[in-house]
C-alpha cells in the first residue's frame, strides 16, 4: 500500500516556504524596432535594480528591485546559471520546480526558453543538467533507481493540445484526491539520455502554433509547457519512491491588436492569449491579497496548469522579458508591475514520497504454537517474549517428529470424503450433459419439421402467383359496373358522400391526364360498395384492390402548351389584379412585371419571366408548376 509522506522543516516542525524568485531580462536595443529613434526607456542600475521613465512625469524615473536583473549583454548561460540551475536539485528529492518566461510579444521569451543551436536556451540546458544530476547521484547512492520522462503540450485558443501527438484533440484537466493537477491522455515519453530528449523535443516544437504579426515575425500563438518527470525508487526495503516534476513554460506574449494589425484567426488567438494572461494577473493579485479569498485558478486553463507554480508546492522562477524601445513602454511598464507583485507570492514545497508498506499474510500456526496459545497467557506477554527471542541466539533446527496416528486417520478420512464428493459431482455433471444433448437433438428434429412445412408453403404460394400472372395476360381492363337494387324500405335523407375515384364520373381533363396501369401482381378481387349522392342506390363494383393497381400521373403535351399560352397571355395583357391572381405573384412582383412590359414590350415566352429581378430559376420552376396545376383545376 502506498502512503504519502509529508516532509517538515527539521527541528521547527513547520512546512518550509519558498518565495517565487523573479528575474528580469532586458532585450538588446534594436534600431529597426525604434522607428522614431527615441532611444531606450529602461536602464539597469546593478545586478538587481533597474529604472524606467515615469510616463506621468518625464523628469522622474521609477525604480524596481528584483532577485536578478539580466542586462542587454547577459548570455544564455549566465541566465541559466544564476536563475534556473539552483532549483533543479529539488526535483531529485521528490519536489517540484517551475520556470516560466513572461512578457509582451517580441520581448524575447521564446529565445530565452528555447534559444538557438549556437546559444541554447533554458529548456535544453535544464534537461541536460537533470541528466547530469541523475548520473552523479547514481554514483553516490547505489540503492536507488531513476527514470526520466517528458510530456509536451500547448494551450491554443483555450484548448490543451499534445505536441508529442499532433493528431490529438482537446485534453481535459483533472485533479486527484491529493489536489495534484493531471491531464489524462497526455503522452508521456521515457527518456534514456539527452540525445533521446533532443530526438523527441525538436519535432514536437515544430508542431507549436506560430504566425507572423506586425510586431513579431515569428510570434507564438500559444502557451507551451514542457514537463520533465523524475521518479526515484529505492531498491531495498522500505521501497520508498520519490517523484519530482520540472515545469518549463514559454508563455505567449500579450498583444495590442491596434499595433499588431491582427484580423480573423489572429484576432481570435490574441483574444485567448490576453484573456489567459489577464486571469494570470488576477491569480497573482488574489495571492498577494491573502485573507483566504478565492484564487481564480479555474478561470483559465493556463492558470489551472500553473496552480502548482503560483501559490502551490513548487520552487518557482519567473523570468520577465522586457523590451527597451519606447513603443513597448506600456507593455514593459505592465510587465514590471506584474513581476513586482509576483515576487511576493510564497509557495510551500514538500517531498512527494510513497512508501510501499509490506503486506504479510497471516500464516498457519504450528501445533506447538497452538498448544502454547492454549495455555491462557496474555497476548502482550507472548509478544514481549517474542521480542526477547529475537535478540537471543536462535536454537539449532531439529528434524520434525512424525505426526500422531489420530492426525493420519483424520487426514485419510478427509481425503476419502473429498474424493467421494468429487466423484458424485462428476456423475451429476455427466448426467446433465447427456440430458442437454437429448434436448438439443429434439430441438433439431422440431426445427427440421418446421423447415419442411415452410418449404411446402412457399411452393404453394409460387404456384398461386404463377396462375394469377397467367390469368392477367388475358384480362387487363377493369370489370364493368353492376347495379344492385336498393334494399332500403324507406327513402333515406340525402347525405353528402365522397365518391370514390373508381366510380366517379371522369372529367375530360382527367381523361387526358390520368392513365391507369393495372398491376401484374393481382391476386384476388375486392368488392367495393359505394353510394350514389341521392342515397337511394347502392352500386357494387368488382375492382382490384387499390394497393394492387399502379397509378401514374402523366400530363398531355397539348394541355400543357395550352396552359403555358394562357399564362403568357395573362403576363402580356393582364391588369394588376389579373397578374396578382396568378399563383406566387404578389403586389410587388405584379408591379415589376408591368414595369418590365412598359420598358421591354410583351413577353415572347413564359421563360422571359426569369429576366425580372428576384425571379430565380428555382422560383420560376415553382411558379410554372403551381400555375399549370391551377389552370388544370379550373
From Swiss-Prot:
Its main location: nucleus. Keywords: ATP-binding, Coiled coil, Cytoplasm, Cytoskeleton, DNA-binding, Microtubule, Motor protein, Nucleotide-binding, Nucleus, Ubl conjugation. GO terms for molecular function: ATP binding; ATP hydrolysis activity; DNA binding; microtubule binding; microtubule motor activity. Signal peptide: none annotated. It is found in: Nucleus; Cytoplasm, Cytoskeleton. It comes from the Eukaryota. Ubiquitinated, leading to its subsequent proteasomal degradation. Residues 379-391 have a biased composition (Basic and acidic residues). Residues 421-471 form a coiled coil. One of its GO terms (biological process) is thigmotaxis. Belongs to the TRAFAC class myosin-kinesin ATPase superfamily. Kinesin family. Kinesin family member that is involved in spindle formation and the movements of chromosomes during mitosis and meiosis. Binds to microtubules and to DNA. This is Kinesin-like protein KIF22. The lineage of its organism: Eukaryota, Metazoa, Chordata, Craniata, Vertebrata.
